[in-house]
Amino acid sequence: MSASSTAAAVPADGSGLIVTEAAETGHHQAFWLWVLCLTGVDYFSTLAYQPSIAITSAGRLAPLATVLLVLVTLFGAVPIYCRVAKSSPHGQGSIAMLQRLVHGWTGKFLVLTLLGFAATDFVITITLSAADAAKHLIENPHFEKAPEWLHSQIGITLTMILTLGALFLKGVREVIGVAVALVVVFLLLNLVVIAGGLMTLLREPQLISAWWERLVAGDLGIAGAHGEPLPAAPAIVPLTFGSAAMMTMLLFPKLALGLSGFETGVAVMPQIKGDATDTEQNPAGRIRRTQYLLLTSALIMSVMLIGSSIVVTTLIPIEALAKGGPAFERALAYLAHAEGGRTLLPFFGDTFGTIYDISTILILCFAGSSALSGLLNLIPRYLPRFGMAPEWVKATRPLVCVIIAACVIVTLLFKASVEDQSAAYATGVMVLILSACAAVFIERYRERSGSRWRRIPWATGFIGLVFLFTAGDIMIAKSEGLIISLFFIAAIMGVSLVSRAFRSDELRTVRFRFVNNESRFRWNTLQHLEVPVLAPHRPGGRTLDEKERELRAWHHLEDDIPVVFVEVSLGDTSEFLQEPVLNIVHEGGRYIIKVSRCASIAPTLASLAISLNGASRPIELHFGWSDESPFKMNLGFVLFGEGNVPFLVKELLQDAIPDTARRPRVIIG
């Protein structure tokens, strides 16, 4: 918002500044199970590739690693995000919690860093989902009849991403009804495939025995899962319980994709219908139903992950799951098509498999649209409020173009490979979960009383250490995700700081608040008196009597001209929009406006002048000279809200009120 637009918002009677930002539009609210499907298009769609990634990462240990993943999900992620839902019930998630807990520029840079990881999460969701959708399309038997030039993994992936961007440029948005249909059909088809596999294992228990015997013998099959040639006579090292447990814990982070979806789960909170008794300050019904959503989605996903892992590990040869194999990145689709000569249920085959592929492709594309929508909501939510967004961020279309361009670059960088992008995706997911753990840990610590050791929430700390280990392992094993995240962080910080510098000449004042009714009454009195002179005074130096004598002498003010003094104390200078608090006192025959909790001095003084500006004659602001260098003063203004105040006030007033006859006058002497 420019200074001129703020001035237009000032009432003609000079009664003060009004809110400069549009009020948030209400969200359409629905039953929590339907909203679960909206977040489920992101969370549940990972079933399309998670079982295959589990095998390539953990080999025959995949079922055990998946069980550990489920335990971490149910006893780690779910409790953490249930607390996030309670502490941030308006859909802003863990990032908003940390912003409240960490103040100043440290908090702003922390938010920008987390936005970089969130951008990684959402962008990779778009590219990875499109890549796996392309994989399912290419491997479908009916698609084999298509011309050879259409069988390009990169080409189809880019086409899907560009189509998604074009739809958003046209104004297409996802709706809950479509999400419900897609999720229900996709989950039912996956349930049929998994149930068919489990029934086969019940009929042929020797398949489980064979898997277990090879596992106990130490034949993990990890090399084969990566497409590497298996040794003709591998050295057998029997696997003990301890070594199996240790390897499972070490391999578990590679399955971290199964933890995606929780941040989205709290982001959709405004769309959940709560109780009739809910209030804005305490939406207890919405919080409770969001916690139902988080637990229900985690339970559904846990059952699906364990079932799919057991079925895929025991029924599909490792060689088929290896890179380049027919089941690579599409394990459940491989079973649905009855490939490999094994028909789990009589109706499995090309027809059922094609239905499964269509459902998978649709939900993966919808997951991409959900991620793009998430970014379009996330970036404008923070950056404009920080004064760190250029004007075009407010428009959807330019932001869509930037995000789609990033998706195209990432797709080309990873050659549209699902496996290669999985680590980058997991990096963004784990850092966001880790930020939620940190926010919950700090909040619980501050809530408790007693000694330092008694205040520490040990359970939350242990969960945080598990996620810290997971995130660290992913970043060390595959640093691509960290590199991409750092690129996004650098881009966001660069644009944000440049934008903050360019927007430093805006008024930035949302409204004035008052410490008590007396101050409000005196404010109204000053507006009706049409104050002729406003004089800033820095507390702690000269007394007001000395300041007034010097002011009248240097500025040739008669004794009968009243002077209102303004004392400004800064609050959080990292904030952009400000709501200064006014304490107006009457001492020694003069009015003193004591301003606190403001982010910047010059916009505060300019806003005061506009609000107190008389209808018959302009108000005058009288300043003294400063001996500081211009560069130091300008830098101090951008970073700390101080600096060359008289010049900046004059610039702000010129932009706000073009009419020189009505504009408050700035006098320096």
Question: What residue ranges belong to the model's regions?
Answer:
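Membrane-interface "cap" regions at the ends of multi-pass membrane proteins
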Residues: M1-Y49, L98-R100, G104-L112
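Loop-to-transmembrane helix boundary motifs in multi-pass membrane proteins
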Residues: G104-K108, E148-T159, K273-M304, P380-K415, ...
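Transmembrane-helix boundary/entry motifs in multi-pass membrane transporters
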Residues: A23-Q29, W34, V84, S88-T120, ...
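Extracellular loop-to-transmembrane helix junctions
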Residues: S52-R100, T106-V111, T127-M160, V185, ...
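Extracellular/periplasmic helix-exit of transmembrane alpha-helices
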Residues: G197-A210, T277-P283, T296-A333
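Hydrophobic alpha-helical segments and their helix-loop junctions in multi-pass secondary transporters
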Residues: L187-P231, I310-P317, A436-S451, G472-M475, ...
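Cytosolic C-terminal regulatory domains/tails of membrane transporters and channels
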Residues: M1-E24, E506-G669
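C-terminal membrane-solvent junction of multi-pass transporters and transport-like membrane proteins
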Residues: S209, E213, P390-L399, I433-L482, ...
